[in-house]
Amino acid sequence: MLTDKLSYFKKRVVRKYYPFFVLSLFIFYPTSSFAEDIISSHIQEIRTIAENGAVSLALQSIDEQQHELDVKNNLTTWLEWERERLSIYQLGQRWQVLQQRVADYEEGLPEIFYLWAKQQQVDALLTLKKGLQARQILQNLIWSEKEVDEKWLPLWQKRIIKSYLVDNEIADALLAAQRYYQDYRSTGIDDRLLRARILLINKREEEVVELLMQDTKHPEGGMLYLLAQLRSGERPPRKVYQSALRQMRGEWADEKLKYMLWAVAAESAKRSGDRPSTANALEFVLAGHKNIELPEGLFSFSSDTLWDMYIEYALYIGNKAQFLIGNDQQWLNAAVKVQKKAPVKARSLYAMVMLKGQNEDTRLRAAKGFLNLMHKRKRGAQLVMKLFLKSDYFKTIDLIPTPIRYDIVKIALSRSNVELASNLMTTIKSAPDGVDSYQWQLRRARIFVLGGKPKKGSEALTRLLEENKTLTQKKLESFLQVVFDLQTSKEHELSFQLFSAVLPKIEEVKLQRELYYWMADSKKAQQDYVSAARLYLRSALHTGNNGLDPWGKTARYQVAEMLAKADLLQDAHAMYQQLLKITKEPARRAVLKHELQKLWLLRESEEKE
């Protein structure tokens, strides 16, 4: 086993002293301590850019700095930038990019930097829940023939434990933890808490009660001790539930502790048969926290745990009130009656009808009621996403009630998750009640385009044109904006077809003229230079224009360029000459003369051939 090798390896380690060594499990290597104590103002500036949200811009700046360096002669500077790069990857949570970057390192980097970077790679893999891959890297480090400072070993061994937890290999995690404590005899609180979590996951609650008996005043220690009391049966579930709520109100309770205590409250309430308290606590757990996760493997809650509790609670209410299964209106009326004073109770009743209702109308009404109430609670949007996108009750998107799908699209777009919004939109064909159908269908098409489904977007736009024989100026402009999105995404044939289809619906001459130009742009991008030249010229001369106004001159210049690319050099020469005659600005005349000179060289080259 890997941990056996660790004990052997300790005996042959060479002791070295590195003053900047980091001991705690997930503390990042300090960027100021490797080469210089004072980081350059340039690095500080780039870090500030990243900290203000422009992570990609910061990384691009680092790319430029490192690209200009001769690594062989400027290794120290290159390493400073590289450490900052990895730090910014961490800041932007770009874990996959980070781990791949380190994996691609070439040999020859200083050992102390290399080992630190590998540690960052392992941490990234653990964050990505790739425990096996992390263990393989640790194994290579441990079995390496190179001698390293023994202070690395406890760091690696702790990560081995973490890797087993990530992979839900709880028995191996316990063995690795036992070996760690046997090797290092650590008495620190952090190590005791880690050991307690692993013992709890392995159903050895009695040992946790004994282990943490002196740590009950420590915030997390008290929480784990409470959980051990619950699972060992040492304390009644109701008492544990009450204690969890009391601890949440303590001045020492930070957001992380409160979140974990809600999980303890949910488990204890469920064990005591307290349905409303269980449902309430589960909502807090599943709504999650922006930057906090429950300890790996310690609790086993899922979306279906809450759905099941909603139904169980609703059935309990219905049985007491003698509601009839199948009389959906009874259940809906009860939900409406209590939704202000008892929202969890109302959500349970709505969930019952939504999942078990006898007809589509009442199921949809229940879904709307459930959704409305859900958005009145903190992190309601997150809970909606979790309940409907990660549940066996809704194995495919089309099983999610339509009002909920509309809502998740809005949530997804608010979080810039266009791919999710696009996937949901493929299952929705009509606009929600009370929403302008044209604008909604247009929005649907745009989501498809931006979400990487250009063909579906084009089909949606084509249907819009078929369903609307005439379009107002405002509708035309919004329609064309989506076609521009399609053109920007380099779908030039689709955008050309749509420009052609909408052209007959346009009455304004100015807009017609502009449309020919945009159509020409698509043909130019497709390298159909003859068609592009024809369309640019049509734009220049549309409805009797002589093409001598600013728009016409611009279009004529494009005509000349397309003719040259189409190898129609004589026509291109004539077009440039016409433009030169009517152009007065010196700078533009210089450009035209340059183009004529290029044409002359091309024609001379052809004549020689």
Which residues does each PLM region occupy?
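N-terminal amphipathic/hydrophobic targeting modules at extreme N-termini
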Residues: 5, 11-19, 584
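Acidic, polar-rich low-complexity tracts and alpha-helical solenoid repeat scaffolds
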Residues: 6, 34-609
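Extended rod-forming repeat segments used as scaffolds/tethers
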Residues: 11, 24-25
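N-terminal signal peptide c-region/cleavage motif recognized by signal peptidases
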Residues: 28-30
